[in-house]
A protein has these predicted regions:
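Exposed beta-strand-loop-beta-strand "reactive/processing" segments of non-cytosolic proteins
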Residues: 61-110, 156-208, 267, 400
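Extended effector regions of multi-domain proteins
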Residues: 109, 114, 118-127, 150-152, ...
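Bacterial N-terminal signal peptides that target proteins for export
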Residues: 2-14
Length: 676
C-alpha cells in the first residue's frame, strides 16, 4: 500500500460530474452547482460553503485539514417520500484535523448554520496527502536513516524512494495516541515498473505524521538488493502481436439513460450513484419496474471496508494489516479508467469530484464507467427435440465500474444489473504483489526454505508474502419498502417416506431470524438460503411474500486469524460471512468510523444491543474474501482474480422477469434513416 502522488489531485473550480462518451466531444449535460436530488454528492459550491461557515464560526482556519466533507443524508422516510421537483434540505458532515486533534461538525447548508461541533479525542481519520509527503521527506532527511542506508550498501540516496504506510494498531508498542506512519523504502537505481519491486529490507522508519518527527529507525540485518528483478511493460517484456479486434459495440445507440447528477435508468432498472471519498461509490434507490410499478429493491449499497493483512512475522511486514477504506479511502485513491481496456469504447466515462484535504475539491478524470455488454451467453434457452425448435434470448447486462488503486493493488468493483432482476456484485483483484528481497535466487538455494516459509519465490531474490483480501459490503436492502424480515432456509436431509422408491431426500426448513447478529451456518445441514422478505405485502398472482436472496458465489473464504490477534480485533467483520443489523443512519462502516486508531468497533458494537429485526428496517453486511497464496504466475503483474456474490429475486416476481425479452436486437439505423 503506497501513497498517491500529489500530482494526482487536481484543484478545480468547476462542475462536479462530467460525462464523456468515448470518441465524442465531452457531453454538456453535467451536474450544475445546485443539486437536483437529495442523494446527490455535495457540489463544489456546497463544499466551499461548508468550509466558509466553519471558518466564520471560528472552528476552522488555514491550518485545518478536512479528511471528511460529505453529505449527511436526509432521514430515509423523507428521501423515500420525496418527488422530483420538490425542495429538500442539504447537510454536510465534516471531520477536521488540526494540531494533532480531531473534531466533527454537522453543517446545515440550507439554513446556513453550524448544527453541532464535537471533539473526538484520539480519533484517527484517514491518511492525508500532506502527511504522506511529510513522512517521506522527514525520513530521507533523518541522519539515522541515512547512516542505516549506507550500512546497507546504498550510497546514492537520491535513487531511493520511500512509501509511508498505515501503521496497523498495536497499543503495546507504546506510541499512545500519536499518529504514526511506518516508512519502508525502495532502490530506484535501475528504473523499473513497478517501482516497488526492489525493496530495501532491514530499514524501517517510524514517523509522527502530525509533527514530522522521526521517532525511530528500525534496522535489521542487510539483504543485498539484486541487480535486476523482472518488471512488466515494453522495456521488460516485449508485447506479442495484436489480436484481431474483439469488440462489444452498440451500433444502434445506447440503452442507458442518464439524468441529473448521476441518476441511471436501463431497461427496467433505475438507481442513483454518488461519489464518496471513503467508499468510492454509493449506489442508492435501486428500483425495478414491474408491470408499470417502480418497486424498491435496495435503499443503499456500498463497499464498507477492506482488510488486507500480510502473513509475514518480519517486523517490517507484520504491521501490514491494512483497512483500505478507513485508512486510505477508495474514492480518494480512485484511478482513471483506460478507454477500451478498463471499460469498452462505448461506455459512458464519468469524471468525478471529491472533497480535498484542504477543503476544496479534486478531480478524478474518467473515474467511473457505465456500460452495457452482451455476455455471449443466453439469458435463457431451450431446444425442443421433438419439433427441432430452438428458443433463446441474448444476455445483456449493465455494468457500473470503478477501480480504486490502493498502492500496489487495483480493485475492480462492479455492480452488474441483469434483466432477470438480479444484481451481481463482483470484485477483481489485480495490480502487482507486494514483495520482499531475499537471499535465494531459486528454490534449490540453501536459504530457500527459510525465505519461502511465509511466501512464494516469484523471481530470483524476490518473495511475495502470503496475505488475505476481505471486502465488507453494506447492503441496505429494502424489499418493497423498509419493513422486512430475514429468513434462513436450511437444506435438511431426511429419510424418504415409507413406500417410496427412494431412501432419502432433502427438504427446506425455514427459520426466521428475530434479532441482530452474525449468521453462522448451522451444522447438520447441507447448505442454506438467505433471503429478506416483506411480510406486509403479497405478490399479485401467487400471494407469496416478495423477497430477495443473498447468494454466495466465489470468494467465500473467511479470516483464519483468532479474535485476539491485534489485526483481527480491528477487522472482526472478516470472521463471518453475513451480519444483520437494524438500520441506523450512523452505522456505516464495518470496522468503525476511525479504524486506524482503535479496535473492537463497527459490527461487533452494532449488534451489542441485539435489537429486533423482525418486520424491521434491516441492513445486511456481506463479507467477500480469499487467502492469496502467491505463486510465480502472479509476477510481474497480477492476472485479475474475480470473486463475487449475487442479490437475486426469490418470490419477488410471479414469473421470470426476463421471459419477455425480444428474440433479437433492434435493427441499427441505416444511413438512409439518418438522412431522413
Amino acid at each position: 500500500m503506497f501513497p498517491i502522488s500529489s500530482t494526482c489531485r487536481h484543484a478545480i473550480a468547476g462542475l462536479a460530474v462530467a460525462l464523456v462518451l468515448a470518441g465524442a466531444v465531452p457531453d454538456t449535460r453535467a451536474q450544475m452547482a445546485d443539486p437536483v436530488h437529495p442523494m446527490d454528492a455535495l457540489t463544489y459550491d456546497e463544499v466551499n460553503r461548508t468550509v466558509a461557515l466553519l471558518r466564520e464560526a471560528g472552528l476552522a482556519d488555514d491550518g485545518t485539514r478536512f479528511p471528511v466533507i460529505t453529505l449527511k443524508e436526509m432521514p430515509k422516510a423523507e428521501v423515500l417520500a420525496w418527488e422530483p421537483g420538490e425542495p429538500f434540505t442539504r447537510t454536510a458532515f465534516v471531520v477536521m484535523r488540526e494540531d494533532g486533534e480531531t473534531s466533527e461538525a454537522v453543517v446545515d447548508l440550507t439554513g446556513g448554520r453550524i448544527v453541532s461541533h464535537e471533539a473526538r479525542p484520539g480519533a484517527q481519520p484517514a491518511i492525508m496527502q500532506e502527511e504522506w509527503d511529510r513522512a517521506r521527506q522527514a525520513t530521507k532527511e533523518d541522519p539515522r536513516w541515512q547512516e542505516a542506508m549506507r550500512r546497507h550498501g546504498i550510497e546514492d540516496l537520491s535513487k531511493v524512494s520511500c512509501a509511508p504506510m498505515a501503521p496497523g494498531y498495536f497499543p503495546e508498542e507504546g506510541f499512545g495516541k500519536r499518529r504514526i506512519l511506518r516508512v519502508p523504502c525502495f532502490d530506484q537505481t535501475i528504473p523499473l515498473h513497478p517501482m516497488q519491486n526492489r525493496p530495501i529490507e532491514g530499514v524501517l522508519a517510524i514517523v509522527d505524521a502530525d509533527t514530522g518527527e522521526v521517532i525511530d529507525v528500525k534496522e535489521a540485518e542487510p539483504v543485498v538488493v539484486p541487480d535486476t528483478a523482472p518488471g512488466y511493460g515494453p522495456d521488460a517484456i516485449p508485447a506479442r502481436g495484436p489480436m484481431k479486434p474483439v469488440l462489444n459495440l452498440t451500433p444502434g445507440g445506447s440503452n442507458i439513460e442518464l439524468e441529473g447528477a448521476l441518476e441511471v435508468s436501463w431497461q427496467d432498472w433505475s438507481f442513483h450513484l454518488r461519489a464518496d471519498r471513503r467508499s468510492g461509490l454509493i449506489l442508492s434507490l435501486a428500483r425495478f419496474r414491474d408491470k408499470g410499478e417502480e418497486r424498491l429493491v435496495a435503499y443503499q449499497m456500498a463497499v464498507s471496508e477492506m482488510f488486507v493483512p500480510y502473513m509475514d512475522p518480519d517486523p517490517a511486514w507484520a504491521f501490514r494489516t491494512y483497512l483500505d477504506a478507513g485508512e486510505f479511502g477508495l474514492g480518494y485513491l480512485i484511478s482513471s479508467l483506460g478507454v477500451g481496456t478498463d471499460c469498452p469504447h462505448q461506455a459512458y466515462y464519468v469524471t468525478l469530484l471529491f472533497p480535498s484535504d484542504e477543503g476544496g475539491m479534486f478531480k478524478a478524470d474518467r473515474a467511473l464507467c457505465i456500460f452495457e455488454r452482451n455476455t455471449g451467453n443466453p439469458a435463457w434457452r431451450h431446444y425442443d427435440a421433438g419439433s427441432g425448435r430452438l428458443t433463446s434470448r441474448p444476455e445483456v447486462e449493465l455494468v457500473v465500474r470503478t477501480i480504486p488503486t490502493i498502492g500496489n493493488y487495483d480493485y475492480i468493483v462492479d455492480w452488474v444489473f441483469t434483466n432477470r432482476g438480479s444484481i451481481k456484485v463482483n470484485v477483481g483483484a489485480t495490480g502487482f504483489d507486494a514483495v520482499k528481497t531475499v537471499r535465494s535466487p531459486d528454490m534449490e538455494a540453501e536459504t530457500a526454505g527459510d525465505d519461502t516459509e511465509f511466501g512464494a519465490l516469484v523471481a530470483p531474490y524476490v518473495v511475495a508474502p502470503y496475505h488475505d483480501h476481505f471486502f465488507s459490503f453494506r447492503l441496505d436492502l429494502d424489499v418493497d419498502g423498509p419493513q422486512n424480515s430475514f429468513v434462513r432456509d436450511l437444506i435438511v436431509p431426511e429419510p424418504a417416506p415409507a413406500g417410496s422408491l427412494r431412501t432419502s431426500l432433502w427438504r427446506l426448513v425455514s427459520e426466521p431470524v428475530g434479532t441482530e447478529g452474525r449468521i453462522v451456518p448451522t451444522r447438520n445441514t447441507h447448505g442454506e438460503v438467505w433471503r429478506l422478505i416483506n411480510p406486509n405485502r403479497r405478490t399479485a398472482m401467487l400471494k407469496g411474500h416478495p423477497g430477495y436472496q443473498i447468494e454466495p458465489g466465489t470468494g467465500n473464504t473467511l479470516s483464519s486469524l483468532p479474535d485476539n490477534d491485534p489485526a483481527q480485533k480491528r477487522a472482526q467483520f472478516s470472521s463471518t460471512r453475513l451480519w444483520l443489523t437494524r438500520y441506523k443512519p450512523d452505522e456505516l462502516y464495518a470496522a468503525g468510523d476511525y479504524p486506524m486508531g482503535e479496535a473492537d468497533r463497527g459490527l461487533p458494537r452494532f449488534i451489542d444491543d441485539r435489537q429486533s429485526i423482525e418486520n424491521a428496517d434491516i441492513v445486511a453486511w456481506y463479507t467477500l474474501g480469499f487467502h492469496h497464496v502467491t505463486r510465480p504466475e502472479d509476477w510481474p503483474i497480477l492476472p485479475t482474480r474475480w470473486l463475487g456474490f449475487t442479490i437475486r429475486p426469490m418470490g419477488f416476481f410471479d414469473r421470470d422477469p426476463s421471459a419477455d425479452l425480444a428474440p433479437e436486437f433492434a435493427r441499427p439505423p441505416s444511413r438512409e434513416d439518418a438522412t431522413q
